[in-house]
From Swiss-Prot:
Source species of the chain: Mycobacterium sp. (strain KMS)
Keywords from the UniProt entry: Ribonucleoprotein, Ribosomal protein
SUPFAM superfamilies referenced in this protein's UniProt entry, alphabetically: Zn-binding ribosomal proteins
Residues covered by region (Disordered): 1-22
Ribonucleoprotein in keyword set: yes
Origin organism lineage: Bacteria, Bacillati, Actinomycetota, Actinomycetes, Mycobacteriales
GO CC terms in record: large ribosomal subunit
Protein name, as recorded: Large ribosomal subunit protein bL32
Pfam family, one: Ribosomal_L32p
GO molecular function per UniProt: structural constituent of ribosome
UniProt gene name: rpmF
UniProt-listed GO biological process terms: translation
Family classification: Belongs to the bacterial ribosomal protein bL32 family.
Length: 57
């Protein structure tokens, strides 16, 4: 793992951190029991198997 050679100032640290932005989760359409739902891609299999309640909002 890389180790910094010198201490980074608070200003530089916060400026670097400010560049990072969270992206909204991309939703994918899935049909369950004849109804169309949009779920995150990582939950597709669980939605198809009925492990998560899609009617609850």
């Amino acid at each position: 793992m890389a180790v910094p050679k010198r201490r980074m100032s608070r200003s530089n640290t916060r400026s670097r951190r400010a560049q990072w932005k969270a992206k909204p989760t991309e939703l994918v359409g899935v049909t369950v029991a004849g109804q169309q739902h949009k779920v995150p891609r990582r939950l597709l299999k669980a939605a198809r198997l009925g492990l998560i309640d899609l009617d609850r909002r």
